[in-house]
Amino acid sequence: MITISDAAQAHFVKLLADQPEGTHIRVFVISPGTAQAECGVSYCPPDAVESDDIELEFNGFSAMVDEKSAPFLEEASIDFVTDQLGSQLTLKAPNAKMRKVSSDAPLAERVEYVIQSEINPQLASHGGNIMLVEITQEGVAVLQFGGGCNGCSQVDITLKDGIEKQLLDMFPGELTGVRDVTDHQHGEHSYA
């Protein structure tokens, strides 16, 4: 479920040495499955362990995960990185905002997952996003742009060279193309 690098494990052991005996760490997700999802790590004293917690044993400590957060922490990783600017703990949880879907899930769910987990994070740097409206019987993913993408002069390039290429590569034989149904209104909100 969660991978913790050797460097991060050593860091946690060092931090926990100053805590009361039996204290572990807790890894959690606030607002899991939403765009506002945030992950965190905290101390977990023995009296804060819940009966439905999942205990993940590591070298010298355990990581406690509440039942609600668990599916959103699949494939999560924690690392302790040191560079010339200092050290920092990093927590990456690719499924925090949206639960990973199985490979046999309906096509619309799998496409939506890719949009939320891979495409929208890229568009977010421009204040934009896309939403899946439907997948037609012909296999065309009908999309609607929002935020900074609405009215952007680069939207056709983003759609054809970026999004369509990525989706067709990921869903060969299932998707045949993409179509934009956005009523584009160029304004101050538009990226370009």
Curated annotation (Swiss-Prot):
The alphabetical list of record keywords is: 4Fe-4S, Iron, Iron-sulfur, Metal-binding
Keyword Cell membrane in the entry? The reply is no
Q: Which Pfam families match?
A: Fe-S_biosyn, NifU
Q: What biological processes does GO assign it?
A: iron-sulfur cluster assembly; protein maturation
Q: Does the keyword Iron-sulfur apply?
A: yes
Q: Which cofactor does it need?
A: [4Fe-4S] cluster
Q: Describe how the cofactor binds.
A: Binds 1 [4Fe-4S] cluster per subunit. The cluster is presumably bound at the interface of two monomers.
Residues annotated for [4Fe-4S] cluster binding in this entry: C149, C152
> Which molecular-function annotations from GO does this UniProt entry contain?
4 iron, 4 sulfur cluster binding; iron ion binding
Describe its assembly: Homodimer.
Q: What does this protein do?
A: Involved in iron-sulfur cluster biogenesis. Binds a 4Fe-4S cluster, can transfer this cluster to apoproteins, and thereby intervenes in the maturation of Fe/S proteins. Could also act as a scaffold/chaperone for damaged Fe/S proteins.
Give the similarity note.
Belongs to the NfuA family.
What this protein is called in its record is Fe/S biogenesis protein NfuA
Species of provenance = Shewanella sp. (strain MR-7)
- Gene from which the chain derives: nfuA
